[in-house]
Amino acid sequence: MANTLVGRKRIRKFFGKIREVAEMPNLIEVQKASYDQFLMVDEPEGGRPDEGLQSVFKSVFPISDFSSTALLEFVKYTFEAPKYDVDECRQRGITFAAPLKVTLRLIVFDVDPDTGAKSVKDIKEQDVYMGDMPLMTENGTFIVNGTERVIVSQMHRSPGVFFDHDKGKTHSSGKLLFAARIIPYRGSWLDVEFDAKDIVYARIDRKRKIPVTSLLFALGLDGEEILSTFYNRISYTRDGADWRVPYDAERLKGFKASTDLIDADSGEVVLEAGKKLTARSARQIAEKGVTALRATDEDLIGQYIAEDMVNYKTGEIYAEAGDEISEKLLKGLADVGIEEIPVLDIDHVNVGPYIRNTLAVDKNSNREGALFDIYRVMRPGEPPTLDTAEAMFHSLFFDAERYDLSAVGRVKMNMRLDLDAPDTMRTLRRDDMLAVVKALVDLRDGKGEIDDIDHLGNRRVRSVGELMENQYRLGLLRMERAIKERMSSVDIDTVMPQDLINAKPAAAAVREFFGSSQLSQFMDQTNPLSEVTHKRRLSALGPGGLTRERAGFEVRDVHPTHYGRICPIETPEGPNIGLINSLATFARVNKYGFIETPFRRVKNGVVTDEVVYLSAMEEARYYVAQASAAMDENRRLTEDLVVCRRAGEVIVVAPDRVDLMDVSPKQLVSVAAALIPFLENDDANRALMGSNMQRQAVPLVRADAPFVGTGMESVVARDSGAAIAARRSGIVDQVDATRIVIRATEETDPTKPGVDIYRLQKFQRSNQSTCITQKPLVRVGEQVGKGDIIADGPSTEFGELALGRNVLVAFMPWNGYNFEDSILLSERIVKDDVFTSIHIEEFEVMARDTKLGPEEITRDIPNVSEEALKNLDEAGIVYIGAEVHAGDILVGKITPKGESPMTPEEKLLRAIFGEKASDVRDTSLRVPPGVTGTIVEVRVFNRHGVDKDERAQAIEREEIERLAKDRDDEQAILDRNTYARLADVLVGQAPVAGPKGFKKDTVLTREGLADYPRSQWWQFAVVDDRLMTEIEAMQKQYDESKKRLEQRFLDKVEKLQRGDELPPGVMKMVKVFVAVKRKIQPGDKMAGRHGNKGVVSRIVPIEDMPFLEDGTHADIVLNPLGVPSRMNVGQILETHLGWAAAGLGRQVAQAVDAYLRSHDATPLREQMRRIYSEAELDGLSDQDLAEIGNNLRRGVPMATPVFNGAKEADIEAMLEMAGLDRSGQSTLYDGRTGEPFDRKVTVGYIYMLKLHHLVDDKIHARSIGPYSLVTQQPLGGKAQFGGQRFGEMEVWALEAYGAAYTLQEMLTVKSDDVAGRTKVYEAIVRGDDTFEAGIPESFNVLVKEMRSLGLNVELISSKRAANDQLEAPPEAAE
């Protein structure tokens, strides 16, 4: 048999017509790349670039003290090796992190008291420990306090400038009020907005508004400059009694003349009154040589003066810039002999007087007043001085410490406003603010468009690295304050950097982020798909994001720019819909945080293989064809008109205008949606449910890849890290259930070990208590290539994702048992463990040191029978492999009791028998109700300095043996490889020296070498210097490798023997893991991949299930009425194709059996050729072919990729090839009567999942249990072992039936009548059935509440009231 079968254990029949060009990026690249870029653990050549952690340190350091006599500089940072590896952290419940060491330099200056000149007095450098920095595991997760967590990426509004209007909601007239907002990455927001009167206002940080001109004054402009910035000017020159005004064809285009337009020079009428000046006529007038028109005084009235009109000799001001020209002003100007009046070019149509009007209403007219105004808005109640006001204004927008646009913000701003500031300019400039106001005024004038804030060019992704960077910066800033204070208070000449720094704030910021941030989530680890999806999730919630309540419909909706970037299907149902999304399959995040998707370039109508990644902004200007556009064999687009997307619209263009083309039809959906075959035939709502429910599928005992898949299964299995891929190519040396040893064959680097040991996980508990277990796929001696799958994990089979099982389905009603989506199952499913899953529950108990003495873990428990202790060892801990049930003891523990006053009898007994017998109580760890299972693992943790018990020592010995075995195996392979290389060098040589007994100059042969022990081979010396050098190098490397192996082993053993870090006051901790086997049962939830979910209603004996002509019974019966209204027809197509797959599988099985009998592979090859293409089978030997055929017995797996899969005709062809009816329907017989059903029934194989909503986890009953402290009513919920609430409506029901006594018990003895319920219990124990209800505790609570409000409420019992009446004097009674 050939040895390279790995990776070909299963071949899928592929239906896709469209060739895939682009490689799908690694699915968890988003997480890994982001965090790697933040940490940059290995310093690149030439130092680290200024990003990530480096930029954080650079931005906070250097720190100087208040008197500038000392400076603390940042030099570099390094990471040390983490103290524990990932598995140790998981077991010990600690964080997987590496110590961060920062090199700091303290420079002390001498300051000359007279001149103030500084000279360096002392420089000290030191490495300072700055806390531990969590590291990411291979799979893109973090281990925090022993649990796996994922940091979800956040979608937020990109920094930059945005223009918007209020959609006419603010003002009753429905007028659009435009607004601009500059959003920095951190710092103050600046809003510029119009009000209903068209005055422009500015707001800083959503505070009180000020006229925008005040802001411009504060920037250093004066009124005239402001007007000249926003308006052009026109000069009116006196010409006799009238005025001359220059003629500008562009400006007057579209102008309607109210009076005749007259040429100022010739006096001719160029345009008659009432006519409109078209672009053509305006141009013709200019061509005639008209340069100026005649204007009258009336034309000037109502215009605005463009500059201050001043008599420079006398200083008299005739008019200020912005003044409106009135008859009086015009007359006044004429009187002083002014011949030329500059006016602002405002025509109230194309250019509005908004800035001029704002200037007119602004109380301020200079910089000082404006600064004071801004100061009063920002800090009300503080008296401003010019210095403080200036400093405050500067710090708002121009101080890099406080204001950061970020590179993204700067790029976006430059693009939107056509500016050319460099990326490094992270603060605002005067030009930026002016450009924003200008753009806003242009919008009001009807030029330009507002921004769409849901466009993916305006939303960006913050991944782990960036979130962490912001958090760490906050921590360092807190630290900076403390450092400054400490620098001032200590003797700076004698201290080292270490003494100035307290790293707690920085470490606390990190801890807080990973422990309690909204974006740091407990990983969804139900199955490999749910892990991958969780890491690819994008959330709009979280700090700095939206809140559920505030998010409107637009934010949640699907946007055209989502195409290929965010999945339109996968999002939760419920309040988070649309706020939590998933990245599309090919999407990636670029350095600016925008999501990019790949396209193929199209040149002159020919599609190339060049792939480009574009963000939503870049894509907008191209014509993009679909991946399914028709091409000929030269890849030329064949259709006359191609359907394309451009800027969110769908249009039809000629092939030569197409710029780009999608790389794959599945690039618009997420990973989960891409796993649904025939997605294109499902309604979107059901596809959403299908995507979400695949993530809840429980890993089953036997994984079974789907007959009808999409080809994505292997990608998910590999990238999720569930299945193990070979790190290097090599030959399998050893295999057992717990590890695989591979000898690397292509390793040339002598410093690396020549062997890879892969440890397989066995029965580990996931975050969701599902079972993680891996099993090998390779055999000893097989050749393995790099990246080949060598072991399956949970929910994977042959390296493919396998979330459920293929079952034979019949779509028909069956006695009402599949009414309303219920599911009817055959008993075979239970008997053959088809849907059986293993769940691992973890229980832990701690022995603490209490005030009354230490708790003790022991087998010696008071008042417990020997029967109850049968599963415990001598240390009081349960054995591995024991079967336990609810209430069984897992770990025996006793706690000292408090001293209680002794009765005389006790004193007597104590005097007779000495020490009191039971001063301890039993606080053992017991199995909670509803759990039955097998103990699979026990871990014992001891505090430093506490003696280990026998159990802990046994566990430690086992672990050390396992480590020693690994070391010995690696050593053996090292020996074998090294000595084989040494033999190759020595054989054929005639050494001049050798070990004892060797005659020199004898030519060595392999047999001759074998006479000497291998360790003596190094003693041979040959003449050839080159060979000698090689042998010496080999020996040195061999010794080093041996030493390394031994050291690694000793380190691990030392860690094992060291005490554990336990919480304060805990002496010992025991964790017990129980494996629970859950068979499927009525009440469990199941689903297909198309959103077809239901609850198991009944499990029917096999003989009663409907059966086919050949006697095969259906496994599952679904209701056909669940299909039409839900419009998820994909499940029917899947059923048909699954039926064909099973039919073909039977044919292949027959051919394989024939081959095994006759050893003639021709019929088998023919059969396989009918199914697969030639290329897939080429080069396979007969034996390999038979092995692959053997894997196809149950069914031939197919792949039908989304939007590119099998069509109806393909399915029919497959059914025909399998010798089945083209309709996909069969005659079924009733299992109970043996009669055929009236009509043919759709029968086939469908892929069903068992979801993580198991009836065992939900069903619950209570008799006696805990009560709430205040109200004394039973608690609610399964976790609290609570009762069922009998609420207001239930009381109405009992009232309606007049069930008075039942109602009374419900409200008293079954709830919160404390004395009554005790009496009932005693009565039931006595066998008595009479009891009396008392006063419910909640009534007392009500009375107390009323008393607390000052109303004294007292109860008067009826007997006492009657007596009082009798004894009272007559007047009192009245």
UniProtKB/Swiss-Prot annotation:
BP GO annotations: DNA-templated transcription
InterPro entries on file: DNA-dir_RNA_pol_bsu_external_1 (IPR019462), DNA-dir_RNA_pol_su2 (IPR015712), DNA-dir_RNAP_su2_dom (IPR007120), DNA-dir_RNAP_su2_hyb_sf (IPR037033), RNA_pol_bsu_bac (IPR010243), RNA_pol_bsu_CS (IPR007121), RNA_pol_bsu_protrusion (IPR007644), RNA_pol_Rpb2_2 (IPR007642)
One GO CC term, this protein: DNA-directed RNA polymerase complex
Matching PROSITE patterns: RNA_POL_BETA
S-S bridge residues: none
EC class of the enzyme, as a word: transferase
Entry's EC annotation: 2.7.7.6
Catalytic reaction(s) noted: RNA(n) + a ribonucleoside 5'-triphosphate = RNA(n+1) + diphosphate
Presence of the UniProt keyword Membrane in the record: no
Oligomer status and interactors: The RNAP catalytic core consists of 2 alpha, 1 beta, 1 beta' and 1 omega subunit. When a sigma factor is associated with the core the holoenzyme is formed, which can initiate transcription.
HAMAP family xref list: RNApol_bact_RpoB
Family per similarity comment: Belongs to the RNA polymerase beta chain family.
Name of the featured protein: DNA-directed RNA polymerase subunit beta
